[in-house]
Structures are given as C-alpha cells and as structure tokens.
Amino acid sequence: MVKHYLKVCLKMTSAHVVVQLFSLALGPLVFYIILGSRTGWYIMSAALSVAYAIWVYSTAYKIAGKDIKSYSQHKAYIAKGLVIAVPTLLITLILTLLYDFSFYHQFTDYDMQMRFEFIVRNVFMGWNFSFEGFRSAADGTVRMLYWVLCYAMMPVFSFLGYWAGMNRYEFGYNFFSKLVYKTPAKTDKENKSLK
C-alpha cells in the first residue's frame, strides 16, 4: 500500500518536474519577442500555467483510471487526489523556506553566501518557473498570486483530475490526454473496420 502511494506521488512530482523543465526550456524561446515587457511575462506564465494544469489533471485522471479497475488492489477514494500532491507541496515548501533564508541570512564567508544564494534561488525559480511571470521583483518581494499558484495549482488540479477519473467523467480528458500522452496510431485494419 505504501509502495503504491510512493509510486503515484512520484508520478505527480514527475509531472511537476516535466512541466517545469518544459517551461524552462521552451517558454522563453517561444515568448522571446514579448518578454521584454512585464505583460509578456504575464502572458507566458498564463500559458505555462494552463499547460501545467492540463498535465497535472491528465496525470491524476490516469492514476484514478487504474485505481478503479476491479482487479486493482488499490481502491480509489476522493481524498487521494489531494494526498498524491503532498510530496510536491512539501518540496515546494522546503524550497520556499530555503529561498527566504537565502535573502535574510548573512554568512560569515561572503563567497559561501554568494554560492548558496545562487544555487537556492535558481533551484527555486526553476522549480516554479511556470509561474515566474507573476512573481513581483528580484528584491525578494513576491505577489500573493504567485504563492497561490505555487501552492494551489497542484492539489486543485490533481483533485479534480482524480475525481473525474474516479467517476469516469471525460470532461476534456480526450483532448487533454492527446496533448500529454502519446496515443498509438490506428492501423489500416482498424481504419477499415470503422468504415
């Protein structure tokens, strides 16, 4: 049972990491022309936040789809959609505390402080890059919307996706799953049988 929870939590954390890496790699390239303005960062973060929501929803939907099978020993329950987001939220909380610590703690060794700040701030920004456009300034002050997105997107959309998968609601799943998961191409035999 614990092994199953660790496995599905790892899937959700992997979904978070994949979207952030995708956002970090392609987001600035796609939106390079408009990133010179603050509005450009908002547009990029809004688009990447939608992609993040779709990916998390689809992953949770797929997990629930496996849990509701009659032969599965893992039973689906509605709160599992929230539980599977907990490890990702804990990592986000730890990185947030380290990020805050890097701004307000002074080391005796200046080089050590600079290395620590560089590593912590870049890891934190990479971990939450999809929402980076909603962060206020480089001086450490951060808008409330940024924190809401960092801490609410994963549990809300994993809950909705798991709930929809548990009840077999296909609201947008066929569309979203084509964006997230590779679907096998139909063979000529299948195409002829459909006609």
Feature-to-residue mapping (PLM):
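Transmembrane alpha-helical segments in integral membrane proteins
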Residues: W55-K62, T141-N174
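Alpha-helical membrane-inserting segments
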Residues: V18, F22-I34, W55-A60, I91-Y99, ...
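Hydrophobic alpha-helical membrane-insertion segments
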Residues: A79-V120
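Membrane-helix interface/capping segments
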Residues: I54-K80, I84, F101
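Hydrophobic alpha-helical transmembrane segments
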Residues: F118-F157
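Transmembrane alpha-helical insertion/packing segments
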Residues: M1-I63
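Short, highly charged, low-complexity non-transmembrane loops/tails of multi-pass membrane proteins
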Residues: R168-K195
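Alpha-helical transmembrane segments of polytopic membrane proteins
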Residues: G40-V50, A79-V83, R121, R143-A152
